[in-house]
């Protein structure tokens, strides 16, 4: 949707050309407009930059950086007038419930943007304003009167936020390339060893790590408060997954699930530009398209898909859905030459090691979609919410096995079978299940990979810490914990959501996730 940049520096002024370089580095995220704000105080200097992809209120009133003069109750959206503002924001994302928030808090607004709602709600509620938001966001607010910087990232980390801090400079951007435009950290001695080890174990680098030292990702559901007078940074989680008990009443599950899904799709279709949908042929994206028919004419809806040569092609399933819903469908077959064309571009797109090869077809389908629409709905997150991965099923099986007497599990863990023996693979898996049932549930991931080469200590520490949190939230059931683990830490935030953010921003449109 957009891109944000900024520099906070002590002892030396930020110059406009630096922010201009950062904006240029991520211009692909926002081709419609850009803005810069520079502020020099007695002991610090601030520069903020923004590149815009217009979705809501396409007029100049959506320009950023955007400011708010509290005494005059006036929104300022011209760069040359921002000195009059008390609060200035650069923001990437969308607050879906901004209209409801305007009504709830009696906010008088001058623009049709959700950016203005964030500014005025921050002025009214302070840092707790994010607790009211239903949406995806990464933003930085400069509060002149309080002398602080307030940064925040949405609950699941849909929108990215990278920052560099060395005690003298705080530099942030929507992508690492924004930071690299003004800071020479792309050197061998700056490579973060822990991040490299986590990458080889996970296939991505999880928050708060980045590939470089002193450079971090703001974590999902996290606020960062920077006291500029004290040079102190404080981070905290503004949201925790509520404690809950699983619902086993099928009727109640269907009723609540349907209501939540319909509400999610409806509110994400708010837009002043054309909306389409990805369609993979799977349950998640097909369900989203099915729900969309309640709020739009599907005969005018553009849907997009990718096919492959060979056994992994799901084109027949896609065709079934398209024939049923009668959408305006666009299909592309991903070929070997597409891979060859993109391979050299891959490292530039993702800035740091990223091992999900599905990023290649995601880029191609995004490129195709941009010819027809500006906003695309997808089915990402469905497996994490509904327990759709085999690891989740294995976790539920493990919960059952743990109910067996311990002596039986000990005997089972010593079955004289090996992994490479033909014909008894299921016996080996059963032996492994018995073995894993004897360890603490929080060590499930740390112990399920035996090869030390791809199970470094930092990986063990990271998975144990995250699974412990998930077990506490999941009624101490491993199946529930593994689902929460994927939702909050593993498959979504720094993996799948990174993939779709980079692909969509590079091809200039906004992607919405629903589950």
UniProtKB/Swiss-Prot annotation:
Biological-process GO terms, alphabetical: asparagine biosynthetic process; L-asparagine biosynthetic process
Which annotated residues bind ATP? Answer: 306, 378-379
What the entry lists under Gene3D superfamilies is as follows:
Glutamine Phosphoribosylpyrophosphate, subunit 1, domain 1, HUPs
Top-level division of the source organism's lineage: Archaea
User: Which UniProt keywords are listed?
Assistant: Amino-acid biosynthesis, Asparagine biosynthesis, ATP-binding, Glutamine amidotransferase, Ligase, Nucleotide-binding
Q: What is this protein called?
A: Putative asparagine synthetase [glutamine-hydrolyzing] 2
* Catalytic site: 2
Q: Which Pfam families does the record associate with it? A: Asn_synthase, GATase_7
**What are the binding positions for L-glutamine in this chain?**
52-56, 92-94, 114
Question: What family does the database annotate?
Answer: Belongs to the asparagine synthetase family.
CDD domains xrefs: Asn_synthase_B_C, AsnB
As its record notes, the protein acts as a catalyst of:
L-aspartate + L-glutamine + ATP + H2O = L-asparagine + L-glutamate + AMP + diphosphate + H(+)
* Domain Glutamine amidotransferase type-2, first and last residues per copy: 2-229
Q: Where is this site: Important for beta-aspartyl-AMP intermediate formation?
A: 380
Natural source organism: Methanocaldococcus jannaschii (strain ATCC 43067 / DSM 2661 / JAL-1 / JCM 10045 / NBRC 100440) (Methanococcus jannaschii)
What Enzyme Commission number does this protein have?
Answer: 6.3.5.4
GO terms of molecular function: asparagine synthase (glutamine-hydrolyzing) activity; ATP binding
Indicate the secretion signal residues: none
**InterPro entries, sorted:** Asn_synth_AEB, Asn_synthase, ASN_synthetase/amidase, AsnB_N, GATase_2_dom, Ntn_hydrolases_N, Rossmann-like_a/b/a_fold
Pathway listed for it?
Amino-acid biosynthesis; L-asparagine biosynthesis; L-asparagine from L-aspartate (L-Gln route): step 1/1
The GO cellular component terms are:
cytosol
């Amino acid at each position: 949707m957009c891109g944000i940049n900024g520099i906070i520096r002590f002892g030396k002024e930020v110059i406009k050309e630096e922010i201009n370089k950062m904006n240029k580095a991520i211009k692909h995220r926002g081709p419609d407009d850009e803005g810069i704000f520079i502020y020099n105080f007695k002991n610090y200097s601030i520069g903020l930059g923004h590149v815009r992809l217009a979705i809501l209120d396409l007029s100049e009133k959506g320009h950023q950086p955007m400011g708010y003069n509290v005494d005059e109750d006036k929104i300022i959206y011209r760069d040359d007038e921002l000195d009059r503002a008390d609060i200035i924001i650069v923001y990437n994302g969308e607050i879906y419930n901004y209209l409801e928030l305007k009504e709830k808090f009696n906010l008088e607004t001058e623009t049709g943007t959700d950016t203005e709602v964030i500014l005025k709600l921050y002025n009214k509620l302070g840092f707790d304003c994010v607790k009211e938001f239903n949406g995806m966001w990464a933003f930085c607010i400069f509060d002149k009167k309080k002398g602080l910087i307030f940064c925040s990232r949405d609950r699941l980390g849909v929108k990215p936020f990278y920052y560099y801090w060395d005690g003298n400079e705080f530099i942030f951007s929507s992508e690492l390339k924004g930071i690299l435009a003004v800071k020479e950290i792309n050197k061998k001695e700056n490579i973060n060893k822990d991040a490299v080890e986590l990458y080889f174990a996970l296939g991505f680098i999880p928050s708060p790590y980045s590939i470089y030292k002193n450079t971090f990702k703001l974590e999902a559901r996290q606020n960062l408060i920077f006291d500029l007078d004290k040079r102190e940074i404080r981070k905290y989680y503004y949201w925790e997954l509520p404690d809950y008990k699983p619902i086993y009443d099928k009727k109640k599950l269907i009723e609540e699930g349907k209501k939540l899904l319909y509400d999610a799709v409806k509110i994400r279709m708010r837009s002043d530009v054309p909306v389409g949908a990805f369609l993979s042929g799977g349950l998640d994206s097909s369900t989203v398209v099915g729900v969309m028919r309640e709020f739009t004419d599907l005969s005018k809806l553009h849907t997009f898909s990718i096919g492959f040569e060979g056994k992994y092609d799901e084109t027949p399933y896609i065709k079934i859905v398209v024939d049923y819903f009668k959408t305006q469908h666009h299909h592309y077959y991903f070929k070997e030459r597409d891979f060859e064309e993109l391979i050299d571009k891959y490292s530039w797109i993702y800035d740091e090691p990223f091992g999900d090869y599905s990023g290649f077809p995601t880029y191609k389908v995004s490129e195709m979609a941009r010819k027809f629409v500006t906003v695309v709905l997808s089915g990402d997150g469905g497996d994490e919410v509904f327990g759709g991965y085999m690891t989740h099923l294995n976790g539920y099986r493990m919960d059952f096995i743990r109910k067996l007497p311990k002596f039986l599990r000990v005997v089972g863990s010593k079955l004289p079978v090996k992994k490479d023996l033909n014909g008894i693979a299921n016996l080996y898996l059963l032996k492994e299940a018995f073995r894993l049932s004897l360890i603490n549930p929080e060590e499930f991931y740390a112990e399920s990979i035996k090869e030390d080469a791809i199970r470094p200590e930092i990986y063990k520490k990271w998975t144990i810490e995250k699974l412990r949190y998930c077990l506490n939230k999941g009624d101490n059931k491993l199946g529930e914990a593994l689902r929460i683990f994927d939702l909050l830490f593993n498959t979504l935030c720094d993996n799948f959501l990174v993939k779709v953010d980079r692909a969509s921003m590079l091809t200039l449109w906004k992607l919405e996730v629903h589950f």
